[in-house]
């Protein structure tokens, strides 16, 4: 048992090291809604933020205060007013907003300052800086309704923020900002986080919600969404009456951020202990990413991919599932291979060997990394190889397999005799291996 834990620790560390190096020196904007701050797991989140800082990541933390503001309004018997799902901040509300936001700022600053206590990094000092880095302006009047002290961002002093980040500080920003006239305005945390991420050219924007991310109809976490897909989710949630949940607020901001140059926005749960670390330091993460370009790419292989392909297929060759290929053979045939890569790891491959005279192609060397065999990568490869075969005028595709007969049959392949093979392939057929021949029409 102890040995298994040690092995798991070593493997986890090996997998995380590339991400530690990748993230060092990058700017992340972390959005903490008021719901996350109220949750019992908040102390762990703060500790993990302190850990990110110790790894050399430049952090801007944006906090919201919606539930705290609502509680403060209720305690003072002041009814909240909304117009078009935006809070109307009258003078009384503004005072209560400033109270709630000010208390949170002090509390979060104190927690971040002591976040590395009771860890091996105890004694390391974290500077937390807040300031008038954002200048606001009023939302104004809409349909005869004056939003009063509800505002929007007018400009951001990104140079001043960068100076603080360069000095090693964590920058903490809340939902209240001043204007050029000295007035205070109530902003939404998603606007603050989104505009900061855009202006600072942040590598990532990270948000917390009550669930683990976005789910599909089967209840599975959707690991990646493109901006148009995320926007569709927002519209669906709003149609269901959800305008203020952590999920919908973050997705709105993530769509804007992604379209404005922020490479990845991550939505994770504030209820899951260690979700921040799992999302940032593992290949598959734990939540949902909004991305312009997928972390997973399917493409033709090049000579630089030989090492990754060999690492993927060697275990299957040793088990007798695949026919052994030497490095030299792979080098000569690399143009026939298609691979799927995830964060520079080759997780699947397949090759297409055409027989132009017979208008038949062979799909061979199909391999999927053990961690991804329960997913649809095999089908993705099959579709890509079939498309490549059609493009070069082939009408049929065959496979030789000893283990995956049913998998191919479920996808339109039927068993055929060896005589159905192209003549040159038939001459090389290994009668000792006794592979089954399955063929599919590409029409």
From Swiss-Prot:
Key word Transferase present: yes
InterPro entries: AceGlu_kinase-like_sf, Acyl_CoA_acyltransferase, Asp/Glu/Uridylate_kinase, GNAT_dom, NAGS_kin, NH2A_AcTrfase
GO cellular component: cytoplasm
EC number in record: 2.3.1.1
Disulfide pairings: none
Location within or outside the cell: Cytoplasm
Sorted UniProt keywords: Acyltransferase, Amino-acid biosynthesis, Arginine biosynthesis, Cytoplasm, Transferase
UniProt GO molecular function: L-glutamate N-acetyltransferase activity
GO biological process, one term: L-arginine biosynthetic process
Reaction catalyzed: L-glutamate + acetyl-CoA = N-acetyl-L-glutamate + CoA + H(+)
Biological or metabolic pathway of the protein: Amino-acid biosynthesis; L-arginine biosynthesis; N(2)-acetyl-L-ornithine from L-glutamate: step 1/4
Record HAMAP family: N_acetyl_glu_synth (MF_01105)
Family note: Belongs to the acetyltransferase family. ArgA subfamily.
Subunit structure: Homohexamer.
Stated name of the protein: Amino-acid acetyltransferase
């Amino acid at each position: 048992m102890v040995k298994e834990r040690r092995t798991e620790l070593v493997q986890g560390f090996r997998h995380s090291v590339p991400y530690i190096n990748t993230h060092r020196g990058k700017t992340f904007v972390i959005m903490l809604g008021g719901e996350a701050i109220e949750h019992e797991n908040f102390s762990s989140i703060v500790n993990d933020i302190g850990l990110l800082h110790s790894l050399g990541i430049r952090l801007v933390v944006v906090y919201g205060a919606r539930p705290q503001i609502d509680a403060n309004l209720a305690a003072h018997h002041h009814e909240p007013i909304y117009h078009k799902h935006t809070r109307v901040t009258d003078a009384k509300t503004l005072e209560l907003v400033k109270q709630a936001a000010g208390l949170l700022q002090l509390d979060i600053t104190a927690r971040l300052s002591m976040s590395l206590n009771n860890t091996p990094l105890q004694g390391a000092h974290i500077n937390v800086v807040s300031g008038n880095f954002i200048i606001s302006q009023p939302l104004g009047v809409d349909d005869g309704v004056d939003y009063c002290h509800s505002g929007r961002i007018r400009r951001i002093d990104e140079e001043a923020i960068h100076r603080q980040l360069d000095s090693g500080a964590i920058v903490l920003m809340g939902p209240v900002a001043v204007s050029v006239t000295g007035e205070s305005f109530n902003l939404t945390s998603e606007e603050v986080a989104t505009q900061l991420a855009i202006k600072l050219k942040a590598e990532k924007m990270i948000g917390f919600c009550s669930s683990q991310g976005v789910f599909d109809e089967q209840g599975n976490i959707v690991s990646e969404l493109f901006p148009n897909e995320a926007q569709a989710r927002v519209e669906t949630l709003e149609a269901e009456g959800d305008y203020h949940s952590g999920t919908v607020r973050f997705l709105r901001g993530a769509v804007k951020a992604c379209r404005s140059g922020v490479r990845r926005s991550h939505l994770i749960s504030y209820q899951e202990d260690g979700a921040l670390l799992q999302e940032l330091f593992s290949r598959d993460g734990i939540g949902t990413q909004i991305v312009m370009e997928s972390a997973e790419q399917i493409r033709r292989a090049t000579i630089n991919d030989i090492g990754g392909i060999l690492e993927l297929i060697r275990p299957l060759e040793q088990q007798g599932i695949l026919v052994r290929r030497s490095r030299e053979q792979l080098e000569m045939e690399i143009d026939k291979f298609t691979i799927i890569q995830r964060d520079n790891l080759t997780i699947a491959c397949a090759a297409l060997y055409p027989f132009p005279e017979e208008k038949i192609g062979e799909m061979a060397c199909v391999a999927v990394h053990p961690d991804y065999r329960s997913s649809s990568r095999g089908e993705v490869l099959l579709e890509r190889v079939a498309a490549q075969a059609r493009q070069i005028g082939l009408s049929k595709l065959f496979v030789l397999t000893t283990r995956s007969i049913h998998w191919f049959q479920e996808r339109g392949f039927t068993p055929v005799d060896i005589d159905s093979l192209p003549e040159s392939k038939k001459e090389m057929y290994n009668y000792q291996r006794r592979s089954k021949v399955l063929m599919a029409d590409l029409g």
